Amino acid sequence: MQAIKCVVVGDGAVGKTCLLLSYTTNAFPGEYILTVFDTYSTNVMVDGRPINLSLWDTAGQDDYDQFRHLSFPQTDVFLVCFALNNPASFENVRAKWYPEVSHHCPNTPIILVGTKADLREDRDTIERLRERRLQPVSHTQGYVMAKEIKAVKYLECSALTQIGLKQVFDEAIRTGLTPPQTPQTRAKKSNCTVL
């Protein structure tokens, strides 16, 4: 059975732990769970192949910045998460999470994940954001950010409703099974010959 290591990063309270628990247990936790560091493991079938998926949940709080990278070695794929109802967490993808991941693991693929998709159309959420002259992050904004940070995919999901949840992890596995393209491997595979 092939093993894939997937590390999940993003601001505190964007739903990283709920994402992992909902996926691995099919149950949504009812209360906020502060994470320092945790791992989950599950055996799944993707495209007819048995996979042992090791999921590494990291703390998003600044207090843990100096330790978080210790979970990065041998990572096959990163899920960089932000909450669709939290524009500040979206901006931190550019300001904090992409720089941190690309500094420590420049050749490891990234999937950008917008969490809490169920709240994008929620009236209370929209009103709370409107009071602060904000709005939920749009799909287009997420897609543009994914291109900017060179993510291999942009996906949205809800841990509460599980909409898009399986797709996030199926894509993480598919991405982890594909060796990263470094400039050297791209050059070797190039069909271009200069004479």
Swiss-Prot record:
It is a lipid-anchor. GO terms for biological process: actin filament organization; axon extension involved in axon guidance; cell chemotaxis; cell projection assembly; cortical cytoskeleton organization; dorsal/ventral axon guidance; establishment or maintenance of cell polarity; motor neuron axon guidance. Coiled coil: none annotated. PROSITE patterns: RHO. One of its GO terms (molecular function) is GTPase activity. A lipid is attached at residue 192 (S-geranylgeranyl cysteine). GTP binds at residues 10-17, 57-61, 115-118. GO terms for cellular component: axon; cell projection; cytoplasmic vesicle; cytoskeleton; plasma membrane. The modification Cysteine methyl ester is found at residue 192. A motif (Effector region) lies at residues 32-40. Residues 193-195 form a propeptide. Pfam families: Ras (PF00071). Keywords: Cell membrane, GTP-binding, Lipoprotein, Membrane, Methylation, Nucleotide-binding, Prenylation. Residues 176-195 are annotated as: Disordered. Disruption phenotype: RNAi-mediated knockdown causes distal tip cells (DTC) to make extra turns in approximately 20 percent of animals during the last phase of gonad morphogenesis. It is found in: Cell membrane. During gonad morphogenesis, plays a role in distal tip cell (DTC)-mediated guidance of gonad elongation. Belongs to the small GTPase superfamily. Rho family. This is Ras-related protein rac-2.
